[in-house]
Amino acid sequence: MQVLILLSLAFLASCVVAYSRRRPGGRGAGNLPPGPPRLPIIGNMLQLGQNPHKSLAHLAKTYGPLMSLKLGNQFVVVVSSPEMAREVLQRHGLVFSTPCAPIAVQILGHGEVSMNMLPATSPIWKKLRKIAREKLFSNQALHDTRAVRWERLRKLADYVGRCSGAMNVGEATFTTMSNLMFSTLFSVEITQYADSDSDSGVNKKFREHVNAITRYIGVPNIADFFPIFAPFDPQGLRRKLTYHFGSLLELVQSLIEQRLRARNAATYRKKDDFLEMLLDLSEGDEYDLSVNEIKHLCVDLIIAGSDTSAATTEWAMVELLLHPDKLAKLKAELKSVVGDKSIIEESDISKLPYLQATVKEVLRYHPAAPLLAPHLAEEETQLNGYIIPKNTKIFINDWTISRDPSIWKNPEMFEPERFLDNDIDFCGQHFELIPFGSGRRICPGLPLASRMLHCMVATLCHNFDWELEKGTESKQLQREDVFGLALQKKIPLRAIPIKV
């Protein structure tokens, strides 16, 4: 990819030299945060590497918690400390509340109606955010849908119990989360477990689309660094994402159309799912909600809900299998609280401090989004005495914060015990642990993700003993990751479940 960038720049350098040398802000560079030296035209692009979160963490050791870079024509500031993250997300939250979506995902009209891409000042964003907060992810809404989650956990336990050898843990958790999202939204299941005879057609295509979307969004795009190249789509990312994202939109559109036709029947009985509630809202006057907005909202929820929680659960199992003593502690706690029940109740979570500590430690050690969704400075402002020009892209490196030795004792070690004697949580107020973000742009699905992370880990650990597949015992091998929308394992976890 780097070769492609250099070749493209070589052919088109004459078009971008003047453009790339403009000052990053409207009133001049001023006292910018420190940063590494830059190459002409491309700036610091080559320093990102294949794992930008790790490359930026290394640079931050030299240039500090507020570091400036030039990525092509984009001026970027990287935040690498809890104090600076609080400044950006809380104290200056309105200035930095606009998301900075990659050009490749600004497709099919999604940017005009997506809760993930609209600025916080947008009336549509405010409307969708209110619906998500009050109707989808409120305590009452989640209480009303707890049976749906319990059933998905039961099916996960049943599938694992049928496995007679090594199984792909990440694939199983992805299937569980995908079916949970579709059941919650549409009262249907879209994927099957690996031993199903019907694992074909829509099932395989859905996995392909979600995996491709999360992978391609994480690929550095020359069109983001040099927007004048955007019409040419030099890496084909826009074309690929249009296909995969468009396919998910078509799938959701078909489910919505089926429901709309069914609702017109005289004998129709309402479904107890989110789509029914959203369509009811669209027919009322309070929200002025369109079917198109419902479609794009559902796709956003499916992508985010299917991938990140599944990946985090897989990482949890990796660390517990690499640390049998931690797994034994967790199993003992589950046995004492859950007893002979095979499926944990969500009400049990508050009685399981070691389970809670384990989930927190996984989110610290393997943050699902190592670089939180980038923000854009709506106006020139100051942070820590430095000028942040208007239109600066802000990255918050949660991976760096989570492994900072000045914050965490033994940060490179997996130790759930570190959370047993403090009240640190991941709900956005403790900036040393913000895997879901904070402030206006905090992940609206956090309450659902938290419930499922705890319950999936508990289900897998309470009902089964585990062994790593022979030849995969290396910690280095198991911890290799791939940067993307969610931080995925490079080599899927294959482990052998033993029914207890």
From Swiss-Prot:
Q: Provide the species name.
A: Salvia fruticosa
Q: Main role?
A: Monooxygenase involved in the biosynthesis of carnosate, a potent antioxidant labdane-related diterpene natural product. Catalyzes the oxidation of 11-hydroxyferruginol to produce carnosate. Mediates the conversion of miltiradien into miltiradien-20-al. Also involved in the production of pisiferic acid and derivative products from ferruginol.
What family is reported?
Belongs to the cytochrome P450 family.
Give the chief site where it resides.
membrane
Q: What class of enzyme is it?
A: oxidoreductase
Q: What is this protein called?
A: Carnosic acid synthase
From the UniProt record, give one GO term of the biological process aspect: terpenoid biosynthetic process
Q: What is its EC number?
A: 1.14.14.61, 1.14.14.-
Q: In which tissues is it expressed?
A: Mostly expressed in young leaves, particularly in glandular trichomes.
